[in-house]
């Protein structure tokens, strides 16, 4: 059961860091490149904005290139106290690029002053920078020169201000004058929803015909949430389309700046509301890095067990609703019965079903109940035969194959260009799953396989991989069942929150600590951390900045569904509307994960 993947990855990180740094200073010199250290297993370099394109192009072309833009966002540095040895900056643009072949990442930071809030767009280097730059512009006011369409993407067009700037209110009650949605404002917002093709570089007609523009959503059942796609049609053929997101935006990152480190945990469950505890994992791991907390083995395995239960639960919903979208009705009724059995296990452990908020900074909320193993065993005995049934009625169904094989397809190069992760990427033949490639929370101690495709990610292969992943999760859960370690479920570190109550009842100092950490929150040492995990829909991560306070200075949530929806137009052009329905069902997304 044991292996050394984690330690191999750590050693390789050190080697790759020196290799990349040496190649960069050989090419560009070192006089204006500044290294930064943080609790992040990546090379972090501050660079002047004039160098962003040359350095990006260089890293994309070197041996074992960095071919995926994983994330791009901004930071308001103006109120940050602990900036020792960092370049002068009022704002920072943060670029995270990945290399699957190196299994190592580079983070580039560009400092900006308030009187020069602009940087050149990198859409010429990475296609998926488009949406990220639009989001960064509307949240911080950072202008990306030469961007093809620098408009609002998440907030309404009529919205004023830049919500992630520090002076912007974090609560509705802090607005002055108070925010009210008057009838006039509502009418203006509705007018903004009127689609004007010219704003998107589209033509209303050509020499031979007038095109039809069709709103699919935001209330259509096949768009899986409040999501609108405007289709440019020639008959039933999709000439082009524009995904319109933001209807589910709740300001999850802004909330991270107003909640204590501990009280933010319930919010993580609701970012991707089907993933449950998987959403808590990257957040608590990132905080634990900042705090220097080592989690007990029993807590690690409990976290993995709950995460894999939620993974199967999410995959069952994906499989059943996807099949329903293309006309196979039976599985959706059966899958909800299966999901209830999993929820029964989760509820017996955590007391909740969909959103347990069960992980804690330093461990988990409580130990396992006495009968946990019996309930889990019954569930694991039941699931394999039900999954086999779904294979029979779906994967072997000739009509389903006709609807999905070769539909919504793309290869490895396109997947990497658009920032695709999860089963969509692995279906192209790229074996990259963070549980194996960069193991966390004890995954290096488990024996399981990573299902990969045959080189083409299409609607059929993505479903095949999801089903195979459920079998692998069952393997992991069986190992949890047989090898659950004994010991505490929470660290005795002073910053563990909330501290162990048994100590608070014995000593006045620990009682005071318990009171302060529960009411105000723990004071986390200043630094930065990043934790990526293999979530249900792809790679999810939290990038946290602590300024030595009880709350996060910056909480960046990178979700997999955001880039997956940006890819839709490139995949579906030239297809028919029924193909789009199949493609949307095969992506596996929920809008809370997209909009945050």
Curated annotation (Swiss-Prot):
GO molecular function: NAD binding; NADH dehydrogenase (ubiquinone) activity; NADH:ubiquinone reductase (non-electrogenic) activity; quinone binding
Enzyme class: translocase
Membrane disposition: Peripheral membrane protein
EC number: 7.1.1.-
Subunit text: NDH-1 is composed of 13 different subunits. Subunits NuoB, CD, E, F, and G constitute the peripheral sector of the complex.
Annotated keywords: Cell inner membrane, Cell membrane, Membrane, Multifunctional enzyme, NAD, Quinone, Translocase, Transport, Ubiquinone
Protein name: NADH-quinone oxidoreductase subunit C/D
Protein role: NDH-1 shuttles electrons from NADH, via FMN and iron-sulfur (Fe-S) centers, to quinones in the respiratory chain. The immediate electron acceptor for the enzyme in this species is believed to be ubiquinone. Couples the redox reaction to proton translocation (for every two electrons transferred, four hydrogen ions are translocated across the cytoplasmic membrane), and thus conserves the redox energy in a proton gradient.
Region (NADH dehydrogenase I subunit D): 210-596
InterPro entries reported in the protein's UniProt record: NADH_DH_suC, NADH_DH_suCD, NADH_Q_OxRdtase_suD, NADH_quin_OxRdtase_su_C/D-like, NADH_UbQ_OxRdtase_30kDa_su, NADH_UbQ_OxRdtase_49kDa_CS, NDH1_su_D/H, NiFe-Hase_large
Region span, NADH dehydrogenase I subunit C: 1-186
Main location: membrane
Gene it is expressed from: nuoC
Domain of life, source organism: Bacteria
One Pfam family recorded for the sequence: Complex1_30kDa
């Amino acid at each position: 059961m044991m292996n050394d993947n984690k330690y191999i990855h750590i050693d390789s990180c050190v080697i790759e860091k020196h290799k990349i740094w040496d190649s960069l200073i050989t090419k560009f010199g070192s006089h204006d490149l500044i290294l930064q250290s943080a609790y992040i297993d990546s090379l972090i370099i501050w660079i002047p904005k004039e160098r962003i394109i040359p350095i990006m192009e260089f890293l994309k072309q070197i041996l074992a290139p960095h071919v995926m833009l994983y994330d791009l966002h901004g930071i308001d540095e103006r109120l940050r106290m602990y900036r020792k040895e960092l370049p002068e900056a009022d704002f920072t643009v943060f670029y995270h690029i990945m290399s699957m072949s190196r299994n190592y990442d580079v983070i580039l930071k560009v400092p900006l002053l308030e009187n020069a809030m602009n940087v050149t767009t990198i859409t010429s280097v990475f296609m998926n920078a488009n949406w990220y730059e639009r989001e960064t512009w509307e949240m911080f006011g950072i202008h990306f020169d030469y961007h093809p369409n620098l408009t609002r993407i998440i907030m309404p067009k009529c919205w004023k201000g830049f919500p992630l700037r520090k002076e912007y209110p974090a609560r509705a009650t802090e607005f002055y004058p108070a925010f009210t949605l008057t009838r006039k404002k509502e009418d203006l917002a509705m007018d903004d929803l009127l689609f004007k093709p010219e704003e998107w570089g589209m033509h209303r007609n050509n020499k031979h015909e007038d095109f039809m523009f069709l709103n699919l959503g935001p209330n259509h059942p096949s768009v899986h949430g409040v999501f609108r796609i405007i289709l440019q049609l020639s008959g039933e053929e999709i000439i082009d389309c524009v995904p319109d997101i933001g209807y589910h935006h709740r300001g999850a990152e802004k909330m991270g700046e107003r909640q204590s480190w501990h009280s933010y945990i319930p919010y993580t469950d609701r970012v991707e509301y089907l993933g449950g505890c998987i959403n808590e994992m990257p957040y608590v791991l990132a905080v634990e890095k900042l705090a220097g907390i080592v989690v007990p083995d029993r807590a690690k395995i409990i976290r993995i067990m709950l995460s894999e239960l939620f993974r199967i639960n999410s995959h069952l919903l994906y499989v059943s609703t996807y099949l329903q979208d293309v006309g196979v009705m039976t599985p959706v009724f059966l899958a909800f019965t299966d999901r209830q059995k999993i929820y029964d296990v989760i509820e017996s452990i955590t007391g909740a079903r969909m959103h347990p908020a069960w992980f804690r900074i330093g461990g988990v909320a409580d130990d396992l109940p006495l009968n946990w193993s019996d309930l889990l065993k019954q569930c694991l005995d039941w699931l394999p035969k039900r999954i086999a049934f779904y294979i029979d009625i779906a994967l072997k169904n000739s009509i389903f194959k006709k609807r999905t094989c070769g539909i919504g397809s793309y290869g490895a190069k396109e997947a990497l260009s658009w920032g695709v992760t999860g089963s969509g990427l692995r279906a192209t033949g790229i074996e990259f799953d963070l549980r194996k490639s960069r193991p966390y929370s004890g995954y290096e101690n488990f024996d399981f396989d990573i299902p990969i495709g045959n080189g083409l990610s299409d609607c059929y292969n993505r479903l095949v991989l999801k089903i195979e992943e459920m079998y692998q999760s069952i393997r992991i859960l069986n190992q949890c069942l047989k090898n659950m370690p004994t010991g505490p479920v929470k660290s005795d570190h002073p910053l563990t929150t909330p501290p162990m109550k048994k100590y608070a009842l014995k000593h006045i100092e620990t009682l005071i600590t318990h009171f302060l950490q529960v009411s105000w929150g723990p004071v986390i040492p200043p630094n930065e951390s990043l934790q990526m995990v293999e979530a249900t829909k792809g790679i999810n991560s939290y990038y946290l900045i602590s300024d030595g306070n009880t709350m996060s200075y910056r909480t960046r949530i990178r979700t997999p569904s955001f880039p997956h929806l940006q890819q839709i137009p490139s995949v579906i052009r030239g297809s028919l509307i029924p193909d789009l329905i199949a493609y949307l069902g095969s992506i596996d997304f929920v809008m809370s994960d997209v909009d945050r």
